[in-house]
């Protein structure tokens, strides 16, 4: 069992989705004995401009514009983090070179946002737990 560590959890499920997820459950279990930051996926440009209005998307937009804090304490040892960054969409790109470049670009932006949150929480020696974020998670360097 892991105890007294700082853990970063990234995955494809957002904390604020209405249905449960294994990733959220794992983060909650980690938080029983460790400090955990759960990182939600940033909005993509397509989400930002084309998604129907919902409170979840509107909240993320307020965070992007600096009108709301992206770091929220969920419980004693667990924080939800919504990055301010907006991603360039990559899911429909067929050229490997361009896909790789944009994925690295998105990962760099996300890494910088995560590091900002880690500094605020004073996380030092941390473990990165990647749950199903295959492309982006592979590129994350914190």
Model-predicted segments: where are they?
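Short amphipathic alpha-helical segments and helix-helix/interface helices
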Residues: 24-28, 115-118, 140-141
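Short loop/helix-cap segments at secondary-structure boundaries that form the rim of catalytic
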Residues: 73-74, 137-142
